[in-house]
Design a protein with these regions (language model features):
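N-terminal Sec signal peptide and the immediately downstream disordered periplasmic leader
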Residues: 1-78, 83-87, 201, 205, ...
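N-terminal plug
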Residues: 34-38, 48-102, 110, 128-133, ...
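Short loop/turn motifs that connect adjacent beta-strands in outer-membrane beta-barrel proteins
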Residues: 41, 177-180, 193, 209-212, ...
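Surface-exposed, low-complexity loop segments enriched in small/polar and acidic residues
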Residues: 104, 133, 225-227, 233-240, ...
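Periplasmic plug
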Residues: 108-154, 182-185, 508, 526
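Outer-membrane beta-barrel translocator/receptor signature
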Residues: 130-133, 145-148, 159-170, 176-236, ...
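C-terminal beta-signal and adjacent terminal beta-strands/loops
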Residues: 711-713, 806-809, 857-866, 888-941
Length: 941
């Protein structure tokens, strides 16, 4: 029979002190009336922390593990998982609720800044439902109200969990064996009175058959209101650098009244069809106000689980989830840019404009060709409505088969279907059709081509497009994607195989089969390239499978000797066979824990991990573009530099043509982009070494510090046409010696013109990343012999967590060393989100009687722009500090009420110009909303 954990699990939901789950090896008894650690293991319990399938406690592991408790979620006042995790020192913000462009309505986790595809997200040690063909988990789909704790393990764990665990693993451990009813309601609103966010959830559970079985069901509803950039002073106007160290109002040259350029002169049309000079400083279109600063969201989530102990040898279990998540992204109206034929006699034009245009019509055909720049505001904002539905089912069995051996086998299936409906797009072909006008027999202005019900389009002045014309050029778009995953897994384990005198040896054997499949069907209008508004996309369809076998071993070698209180080694190995080009893959790890005395332990680990290419990496459809690039064999130096001259000849350019404009003087090269079925796996080597202090002279105190180093090779990325050319032909820095001549095959030449054509810029195993740093955490739980509110005692809990980033070296093309950039302490066009060298999170919680008060302090160190060649108006973002305050009141047994303030001092985000991400700042890193308040209620019975 399983022990009844009901009391411990119920306690974990109450805001009565700072939870430290799986922290200490032994639980310290709490004084009367002071809440003990709600998630500390009961006597004889084993906490199965992430990083090992053999169980154990957090501080006994060779790999560093950070733990976030359910109480941390409650104290934060946040309703989405993303908003709690993004403030952890180990994570660099990724896609969040502040991500409008790009967005997609999802929230992802990004350990170490290595990318969400290199962070493996698990739920109860099993893979969870992905949201797209990149096989990334949307954190919105994880039920926050069911979370008991979150384990975050740094570094490669592929030997234990398989592909994707390069940066590490985030494992959400859910409540189990719950009996009773628990309901929560939370409402959060900004001081500005906007961005209201409501979450309500209820958990019902009960035991049956005298405790042999348990069943729970959970419902969760979230509604988040959107906030436009117009609602904040710093984001309501697009900002750009003024070239003199300051910021000025910026915008787009595609304006409401139409800008047109003929003969190098820019003019604009007024509402009456007249023209005037265009002034970018005053006439540029401010696209900022229409964009979301917080995207609206509505989510419904249901989860159910049950298990039944048939006998000691057989417990059957099942679980299922259904999630529907609806999120909108919004951009300013579509900008139309293109060369069009303007009817010089159009009645939409004033007499002065007609006269001007006739003078610019040398062939007298009645049309003038001009490049126009028009913001189609009459069509409305561009809106992407994402409706994501996902479900997951797990069916399994586990039990004791004697001799200390246990087994666990399960099958899981998950599927996500995403429907994206776009509005505000326009058809390029219909715009051109509606601009080509003539007069009918009655003297009415009509389309020259009247097919499809064409309506003449009056772009000559703001607000002049009629409703009928706007309807004619508008094109509805709907994209559909699906991603599915099947996992069949079985393992046997023995935590007491034999004893070498220092403790029981544990071992696990397992096998796993996994199949991934994805499909993306873009609207024909998008894939055909006719849409102007949102980016086009190519279809995707494909899948792969992997068969795996693994083992894990933990061996205590020595114990209770001088300076060897405990010495344990562990190892893991996994063999994987992919149906893709990756084929056979081996991953492995080894670690050691050496406790010199009870107070002091040293630990270290090495791991080889992999990230297999995703469905998207492998099967994304091909697309074509024309990036700016120059064929080096057409340059004058190709005639005089012997290295470059030889490379040109070797790649098919006749010696007589080298240094001439045989390509017509083109400054663009046709390039093919897309997925690559020949991709192999990324590999990483992770080293960690750390110290654990638990001094007996200071009960309740623990300190850990761990150094980590992660090196990724065969990094999957695109090279870029310019870098393809540099790799093949070299550059001035190396005397035009090829860096890697294998890249020359990606630059084929036309057999007749010898020009580079169809350069292949598909995904490749080409880059590399090296990062290293130190994680540290200190916790202190201090019982006090005084109290308040009717209590004679109290407790003070302190926690300081931090990361010192030493280096983050990224190179998109490992063959070209000078492309390497160290992103530690930087942000910008290459590094993206700020990589602060110091990230700290400190929480102090005081609990006495029915009252708990908690303060959270968050720190981000200063960062500098990563582009040394450009001087921006904002070259440095100063250090940022945030403070949050929460108070919880236990009104009576089973009823707790909480209130809180986030960003107490109303710290505003940094305002940037040309080197911003979006909304004139980095909204996923720095709080874009200002001071916010929340209130929550927890009821249990």
């Amino acid at each position: 029979m399983r022990p009844d954990f009901r009391k411990r699990l119920l306690a974990s939901t109450l805001l009565l002190g700072m939870g430290t789950p799986a922290l200490a090896q032994t639980a310290t008894p709490a004084p009367t009336e002071v809440p003990a650690d709600p998630a500390a293991p009961a006597d004889g319990d084993t906490i199965v922390v992430t990083g090992s399938r053999l169980g154990g406690l957090q501080l006994d592991q060779a790999a560093p593990i950070a733990v976030v408790s359910a109480q941390d979620f409650a104290l934060s006042g946040q309703t989405n998982v993303e908003n709690v995790l993004k403030d952890l020192p180990q994570l660099v913000p990724s896609t969040t609720g502040a991500s409008n462009n790009p967005g997609g309505g999802v929230a992802t986790a990004n350990l170490r800044g290595l990318g969400s595809t290199r962070t493996l997200v698990l739920v109860d040690n099993r893979r969870y439902v992905a949201y797209d063909s990149n096989q990334v988990v949307d954190l919105n789909t994880i039920p926050a109200g069911l979370i008991e704790r979150v384990d975050i393990v740094s570094g490669g764990r592929s030997a234990v969990y398989g592909s994707d665990a390069i940066a590490g693993v985030i494992n959400f451990v859910m409540k189990k064996d719950f009996s009773g009813v628990q309901a929560n309601a939370n409402y959060r609103i900004n001081e500005a009175g906007d961005g209201g966010n409501f979450n309500g959830n209820i958990l019902l559970g009960g035991n049956f058959e005298d405790g042999r079985g348990n069943a729970t069901i959970y419902f969760d509803y979230t509604k988040r209101n959107g906030i436009l950039q117009s609602a904040r002073d710093y984001s309501k106007q697009a900002q750009v650098d003024d070239g003199d160290g300051g910021l000025i109002a910026g915008g787009s040259g595609s304006i409401e009244g139409t800008r047109f350029a003929i003969g190098g002169v820019n003019r604009k049309f007024g509402t009456d069809g007249s023209y005037s000079a265009y002034n970018s400083a005053t006439d540029a279109y401010n696209y900022a106000p229409s964009n979301y600063l917080q995207v609206p969201q509505e989510r419904f989530l249901m989860s159910a689980q049950t298990h039944y102990e048939v006998s000691d040898a057989l417990t059957v279990y099942a679980e299922g989830q259904f999630i529907n998540n609806r999120v909108k992204n919004q951009l300013a109206p579509t900008p139309f840019t293109g060369s069009v034929a303007i009817d010089v006699d159009s009645s939409f034009l004033s007499a002065s404009s007609q006269s001007l245009l006739r003078g610019l019509d040398p062939d007298g055909d009645g049309y003038v060709t001009s490049t126009i720049y028009r913001r189609l505001t009459e069509v409305g904002n561009r809106v992407s409505s994402n409706d994501n539905s996902a479900y997951r089912a797990v069916l399994g069995a586990k039990g004791d088969i004697g001799g200390g051996w246990n087994y666990d086998a399960y099958y899981s299936y998950s599927r996500t279907k995403s429907i994206e409906t776009q509005s505000g797009n326009v058809s390029r072909s219909r715009v051109l059709q509606a601009l080509r006008t003539t007069y009918d027999a009655n003297g009415n202005l009509v389309c020259s081509d009247t097919s499809n019900g064409c309506v003449p389009l009056n772009i000559y002045g703001a607000g002049n497009i009629s409703a009928a014309a706007a309807a004619f050029i508008t094109i509805p778009v709907q994209n559909v994607s699906t991603i599915s995953e099947q996992v069949a897994s079985a393992s046997i384990s023995n935590r007491n195989l034999f004893d070498l005198g220092a403790g029981p040896v544990g071992i696990v054997f397992g096998t796993e089969y996994r199949r991934e499949h994805g499909n993306y069907s873009p609207d024909f209008a998008l894939s055909s390239g006719d849409v102007v508004g949102f980016n086009g996309g190519e279809g995707l369809g494909g899948g792969y499978n992997v068969k795996e076998a693994y083992t894990e071993l933990a061996v205590p070698l020595l114990a209770d000797l001088p300076f060897i209180k405990k010495l344990e080694v562990n190892g893991a190995y996994r063999y994987s066979y992919y149906s893709t080009a990756a084929k056979s893959v081996n991953t492995y790890s080894g670690g050691v824990v050496w406790s010199l005395i009870s107070d002091l332990s040293l630990r270290g680990q090495y791991s080889r991990a992999v990230r297999a290419p995703t469905v998207s990496d492998l099967f994304s459809g091909a697309s074509q573009d024309f990036p700016a690039a120059t064929d080096p064999c057409t340059t004058a130096i190709a005639r005089t530099n012997t290295n470059l001259n030889a490379s040109c000849v070797a790649n098919g350019v006749p010696a007589s043509l080298i240094g001439t404009a045989y390509d017509g003087g083109s400054t663009q090269i046709q390039t093919i982009n897309g997925g690559n079925p020949a991709l192999r796996e990324e590999t990483s080597d992770t080293y960690t070494a750390g110290i654990v202090l638990q001094p007996r002279f200071l009960p309740g105190f623990t300190f850990t510090a761990d150094y980590y180093k992660i090196k990724i090779a065969n990094y999957i990325s695109t090279v870029g046409t310019t870098n393809l050319i540099r790799a093949c032909y070299g550059d001035a820095d190396n005397g035009y010696t090829p860096y890697d001549s294998s890249y020359c095959s990606s630059l084929p030449r036309d057999a007749n013109s010898y020009a580079i054509t169809d350069a292949t810029n598909t995904l490749a195993n080409t880059g590399g990343v090296n990062t290293r740093g130190v994680d540290f955490e200190a916790r202190y739980s201090l019982p006090l012999d005084f109290g308040a509110f009717g209590s004679t005692t109290s407790r003070l809990d302190l926690r300081v967590s931090g990361t010192r980033l030493i280096a983050f070296d990224y190179n998109p093309v490992a063959a070209i060393p000078d492309l390497t950039i160290n992103c530690a302490g930087k942000f910008g066009q290459t590094c993206g989100n700020p990589y602060a060298k110091w990230r700290l999170s400190t929480r102090a919680t005081y609990a006495t009687g029915p009252v708990t008060v908690s303060v959270l302090y968050r720190h981000l160190s200063a960062v500098k722009d990563d582009d040394s060649a450009t001087v921006y108006a904002v070259e440095k973002i100063k250090a940022y500090d945030y403070f949050d305050l929460t108070a919880a009141f236990k009104i009576q047994d089973g009823f707790t009420w909480s209130v809180g303030v986030n960003n107490i001092f109303n710290k505003q985000p940094p305002v940037l110009g040309d080197n911003q991400q979006q909304a004139n700042t980095y909204p996923s890193t720095y709080d874009p909303y200002g001071r916010a308040f929340f209130v929550s209620t927890n009821v249990e019975f």
